[in-house]
């Protein structure tokens, strides 16, 4: 006689296989839909062409004519895709990008060994942050640290934004400021340009450029926009950046402690709710920070190779 087994959706790995009796314990290439386990659909080629190096970031946006573009940052290059053609838009100047093994490669072919400290031992793997300022792509590599821009349809490579500071990461706010995190070599400095003027970064009494230092023991990692402002993650906590206008322009307050992010791409924002992977748990921001219950967290954090945690990617 056969008995029908009805197992709750999702995996349970917070304990041993014996402790997960009555639950799914292991799976691969499956999904849960309407409470039932289903196979993943097949893979389809998203674009033609070949990327040089492992992709570390992606961003999609539309230009002023409503046409879609996507950008991809790898450990060696920067690419743009217009729906048909994949273009290498890596800046023409020699761009040094630190690979995970510590080897520094530049576009002129020279090699050197660059010592940088990562989260643990060894070098922190190179990654990009990408956003759009209107129809312009804005890009920053956390090892090379120059802030670049790229004009769709321009036929040119990405170029450095004039007067912009060095940075570890960037994002664009709802008020159309480019935010530079870890600006000018200070891991806690947050700098922004004059509103709508991406080449003016020095504050005066007649513009809205400026900078602030995060009040934190951590270092700025990444940022993104929600309805209430811009969220800035460090490796120890979370901050909210609000537009105030003259004279301060922006104010920053800490909105979460001991909830720092594990990597620069370990978050996603949907409907102004932010979700992210922390150093030892999962979190979300809904106007306040709260932990997310996860039935596989023990397995994830126990077996993770933390040397490469900056490669963690969150997607929806």
Model-derived features: where do they sit?
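Beta-propeller fold detector
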Residues: 87-96, 158-163, 203-205, 250-255, ...
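Short glycine/acidic-enriched loop and turn motifs that connect beta-strands
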Residues: 77, 144-145, 184-186, 281-283
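Repeated scaffold domains used in trafficking and secretory/extracellular systems
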Residues: 52-63, 95-109, 115-132, 163-175, ...
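Hydrophobic or amphipathic alpha-helical targeting/insertion segments
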Residues: 132-161
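A short beta-strand motif characteristic of beta-propeller blades
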Residues: 43-49, 112-118, 156-162, 207-213, ...
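Beta-sheet-dominated scaffold domains
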Residues: 216-316
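N-terminal beta-propeller domains
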Residues: 1-111, 167-239
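Short loop/turn segments that connect beta-strands within beta-propeller blades
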Residues: 82-84, 151-154, 243-246, 288
């Amino acid at each position: 006689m056969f008995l029908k087994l009805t197992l709750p959706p999702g995996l349970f790995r917070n304990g041993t296989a014996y402790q997960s009796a009555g639950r799914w314990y292991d799976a691969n290439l499956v999904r849960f839909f309407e409470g039932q386990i289903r196979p993943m659909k097949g893979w389809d080629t998203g674009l033609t062409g070949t990327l040089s190096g492992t992709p570390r970031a992606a961003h999609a946006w539309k230009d002023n004519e409503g046409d879609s573009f996507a950008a991809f940052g790898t450990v060696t290059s920067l690419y743009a895709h217009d729906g048909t053609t994949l273009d290498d838009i890596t800046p023409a100047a020699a761009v040094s990008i630190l690979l995970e093994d510590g080897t520094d490669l530049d576009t002129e072919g020279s090699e050197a060994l660059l010592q940088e400290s990562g989260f643990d031992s060894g070098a922190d793997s190179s990654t990009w942050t990408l956003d759009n300022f209107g129809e312009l792509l804005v890009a920053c590599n956390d090892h090379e640290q120059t802030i670049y821009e790229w004009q769709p349809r321009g036929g040119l490579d990405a170029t450095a934004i004039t007067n912009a500071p060095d940075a570890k990461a960037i994002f664009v706010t709802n008020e159309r400021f480019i935010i530079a995190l870890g600006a000018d070599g200070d891991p806690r400095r947050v700098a922004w340009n004059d509103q709508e003027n991406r080449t003016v970064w020095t504050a005066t009494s007649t513009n809205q450029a400026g900078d602030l230092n995060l009040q934190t023991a951590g270092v700025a990692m990444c940022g993104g926009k929600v309805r209430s402002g811009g969220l800035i993650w460090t490796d120890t906590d979370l901050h909210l950046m609000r537009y105030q206008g003259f004279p301060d322009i922006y104010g920053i307050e800490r909105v979460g402690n001991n909830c720092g992010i594990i990597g620069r791409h370990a978050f996603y924002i949907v409907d102004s709710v932010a979700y992210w992977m922390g150093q030892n748990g999962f979190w979300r921001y809904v106007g306040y920070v709260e932990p997310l219950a996860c039935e596989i967290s023990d397995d994830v954090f126990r077996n993770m190779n933390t040397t490469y945690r900056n490669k963690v990617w969150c997607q929806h």
